[in-house]
Curated annotation (Swiss-Prot):
One function term, GO molecular function aspect: rRNA (pseudouridine-N3-)-methyltransferase activity
A cellular-component GO term for this protein: cytoplasm
Protein name: Ribosomal RNA large subunit methyltransferase H
Gene that this sequence comes from: rlmH
Protein origin, superkingdom: Bacteria
């Protein structure tokens, strides 16, 4: 099983890349974590935002292979504790399908992406900056793995 974070937005600050890579390298080879960046469409004063979101959604879905699981990160998704995420990670592993975690742009995910989602996950009721979400996701996937493997990282 491979986990891909498919996120709208690119050219993140260096600290974001370093934070993400820190957790990627901590994970074992049998749980690869990959980042796929979808360029954010330019939003001008008179932009058709619905069209831009739809285009970003199409680009996101083009990175998903047939049969792979889609998990969207949404404000109204289900909040998971660390232990619940670890249980989900174990279910995903046993299912043996690749998992795609989908993070939309500033206006959220395209309806087409949400319609394909098998699970909706909310990190927090707070609005979080997109760069921070990447690091937070990397850390939480790592933490869930440590719970499953009995590693002392999560106490």
């Amino acid at each position: 099983m491979r986990i891909k974070l498919i996120a709208v937005g690119s050219r993140m600050p260096r600290w974001v890349e370093e934070g993400w890579q820190e957790y990627v390298k901590r994970l074992p080879a049998e749980l690869p974590l990959e980042l796929v960046e979808i360029p954010l469409n330019t939003r001008g004063k008179n932009a058709d935002v619905a069209r831009l979101i739809r285009q970003e959604g199409e680009a996101m879905l083009s990175k998903v292979q047939p049969g792979e699981r889609i998990v969207t990160l949404e404000v109204h998704g289900k909040p998971w504790s660390t232990e619940q995420l670890a249980a989900e990670l174990e279910r995903w592993r046993l299912d043996a399908r690749n998992v795609n975690l989908m993070v939309g742009g500033p206006e959220g995910l395209a309806p087409e992406v949400c319609a394909r989602s098998e699970q909706r996950w909310s990190l927090s009721p707070l609005t979080l900056p997109h760069p921070l979400v990447r690091i937070l996701l990397g850390e939480q996937i790592y933490r869930a793995w440590t719970v499953l493997s009995g590693h002392p990282y999560h106490k």
